[in-house]
Amino acid sequence: MKKEPVVSLRDVLDRADAAARRGESAGAAIYPTGFHPLDSYLGGGLRSGELTLLGGPQGLGKTTMALQVARNVAASGCDVVYFSFEHDEVSLLTRLVALEAGLRDGTAAVTLRQVRQAVDATADSPSGLAGRLEGLGGGSDAVKAVGEYAERIVVHRSDGRRTSADVVRSVVAGFVKADRQPLVVVDYIQKVAVERDLPNEDERTTVVVEALKDLALEYGVPVLAIVAADKAGLAKTGRLRIFDLRGSSALAYEADVVLMLNDKYDVVARHHLVYDVANAERFRGWVVVSLEKNRSGLDRIDLEFRKVFEQGRFDTEGNAVAEQLTDDRVFVE
């Protein structure tokens, strides 16, 4: 529902009272990410009216995590509109099928590579895609599982030359008019077209992030946006922080929640490797998700989740990081 710009606190109190009497929440709608214990620190999950940023190095799984959150939200019965600037809809479907198989059959499930091969195959299959994946670690069941929530995920094949913040707003407005409050995923912010001729990337990023924050507030939807690192961040060998993201000052100010991904091997303190070299390989299998900003709760929290990239997913049951972390990368030969 589009929010009115002026409202009496008397009306707000009356609505809160009425909601309490009905046994309903008077606050923000909560969209669980499905990642534990991240949701507990976020007060249950992503919140309507808030902008959440997801940043980190290239190739560490930002899209993987965003798509997995989208899947979890859709599977819970909520709508998702996914603005995809780098992946087509078939690629996203392929990832979801592999992810779904992994959730059901664990590491014995069909791999992302095998699902891609099945999708790309040209041989006739009377049973469709499920038939091509029959006998491959729960592949056919995964196709059926995706089908149960696929209608609730709408993919917008976005274009860096034409898909502006106004286009994003227009698409979301169509959902809201139909009385649907979707999770909005933008993959990724720096690809969103800016109609004004601005001299540098920081200014363009500022325009986009401000527009996404306004969108979240105006329509009462949660927005999850992926953010790329700036040039210095891309060259950095240690831990990426919020100030390593493109347009970092605007991002830090406008966002309600900032999540930063880092490879655990790259950020764990030296003494954890020096005294137990075997840890090095173990740490490579985990990503550290740092809650760098959280307007609704605690921040500066470091959590870890196991990578299962052969199935295009993370293990959603994570832990608080027990080891000391550092901003400087430690190399062990």
Residue ranges with predicted function:
Residues K2-D14, Q58, G102-R113, Q117, ...:
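C-terminal regions of RecA-like/P-loop NTPase motor modules
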Residues K2, V6, E24, A28, ...:
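Hydrophobic alpha-helical scaffolding
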